Each structure stands twice: as C-alpha cells, then as structure tokens.
Amino acid sequence: MVNAVLIGVPKSGSTTLADWLQEHPGVAMSRIKEPNFYASELDPLHFSPAFLRISPDADSDYWAQPDPLPRRHQAFVRQPSQYARIWPDAGPNQLRMEASTSYFWSPSAARDLAAGNPGVKALVLLRNPVDRAFSHYRMARKYGLVSGSFIEELDRDASGSASWGQRENFAALSLYADSYQRWSASGAALHTYIYEEAFQNPHAFWAEVQQDLGLSAIALPHAERVHAAHDVRWPALTAFAQHHWLGRWLVGHMPRSLKMKAIAASLAPEPLRLTEAERAKAWTYFADDVARLEGLMGRNLSLWT
C-alpha cells in the first residue's frame, strides 16, 4: 500500500523534505502528510484537551468529502479504507509516500510497517538531540502548552514515561538508540540522514534521497526551510488565550483587526537561544544514548558535541 515513509524525527526537517518530495513527479505524497496509521499507540481518545486543540484528528466531515481529499498536515487514521484514500491519484510508476514522524518512536510502527508493505523504505533524519528538544520546546511554548524555561520543562518531561498526546516528550523523542535498533531489525530498508549534514548542503542531500528512493534526479525544488519557529513574549498569557475557556472566548469575540494586533504584539522580537550552561545541562540527558547510537550506526557523531 505504501512504498516509502519518512518516519522522523519531529523537528528535524521532515516537513521540508516531504515538501520537496511532493514536487517530484515520481512521488505520490499522501493527502495527509502524517496519517499515523501504523503508530497504534497514538489514540486521540486519550489525548489531553490542549493537545487535541493543537493536533485535531480528521473528523467524519473530512472523510465524507469526495476524492481527492483536501490536503492536511496530520490525522490519526485507523481504518485501512481511509488510509488507502490518501493517495487518490497515485500513478502506477509513482512511489506512494507519507511522512508520519511518530513512526520512529513507535514500536508498533517498526513492527507493522514492513510486515504490511514488503520492500518498504524508511527514511529518518536525526538531529542533535539537544537542538531537537529545544526546537520542540519552542513550538510547544508558542502553542501555549508549556510556560517554564527549557531546562524546567525538560526536567519535568523526563521525569515521567513517554506518552503521545499527554506529554510533550521533549526527552523521549530525542533518545534515538532504542528506536534505531528497532527499525534496523524491522525488515524495512532504513536510510538514515544527519540533519546538520543534510541542511548544510541541501543539494547533495536531495540528490542522495532521490538515489536512495530510486527516483530520477530533478533539481532541488527550493532551499527554504518549512515551518520556521517563532517565539512568544508571554507564554503564560499564550496558554490562557489558547487553552483556558475564558481566554478562548475572549479571543473568539475580538474584532479581527484587534486580534491581528494582539498576535503581532505577542511575538518576541528576538528568537530564544540556548545558553552554553543550558546546552551543557541538557546534554546530560542524551550523552549515553548518543554514545550507544554511535555504536549501532558505526559512525562518529561528534558533530553534535
């Protein structure tokens, strides 16, 4: 049903790569970029209300529409008949692809993807785990899901078990070794790219991806990064406006002109940056895992230190 999948990791350039692949005539990219079909651990019935507001599922109205379905970023597809609909116009010589970044983390995806799709290729971008976690934190802060400092939120997040839709998983999604080991034994053809190398030379990276997928070579569609991060000045106020019933009511009843001014005023003038002390502290969560990953991959990852 699917020929190749971009399996992760979140905040590591997967949306940019998916955007490039969508422009390739040899690829039929899914109408839902991240359908999460093979990650059975992800259950919207158990997601927090705040998480669901940021990451809503595709509802019955969406599926009632005729093909081709409108493009959307994410859903939690469980029915095979619905999963098949996300490639309505795939040609016989096109690769059917999707880009669920939950898959690298998901044991069920590593177990079931290759079993259901013999010969499937799995592509993963791995990023410096501290930078990945910090980028994830900035996104969560922008959406009002956290309001503490990066280290405070990383400490809090790492103290519990990973649970998609209930926690942010800043730490868990930056621990790569177990997932890499699972996917190496999954039966899928695993292709691994290092984010820092890939986007330092995007033209060479794009050529490598096309070769790995058996695609004819075309020029890089664009060099711009998709979904660049923005920061907010007042994360507690953002959380109130987006997730408290009164805040949502007030925002919903604002005149559009006032709402646009409020949004502009809420943006921080400068991006958040890690201090050296914060980076050193955060690295302690990931150092042992990176050392283990080096052994599994058989390569040096000192570019992350």
Where do the PLM segments sit?
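PAPS-dependent sulfotransferase catalytic domain
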Residues: 75-89, 144-221
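The conserved 3'-phosphoadenosine-5'-phosphosulfate
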Residues: 32-33, 181-280, 298-305
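Surface-exposed cleft-lining segments at the edges of enzyme active sites
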Residues: 68-70, 96-101, 158-172, 229, ...
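Canonical radical SAM enzyme core domain
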Residues: 127-130, 199-200
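Generic structural signal for small/hydrophobic residues in well-ordered secondary structure
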Residues: 13-14, 83, 97, 113, ...
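PAPS-dependent sulfotransferase catalytic core
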Residues: 1-94, 99-100, 116, 129-135, ...
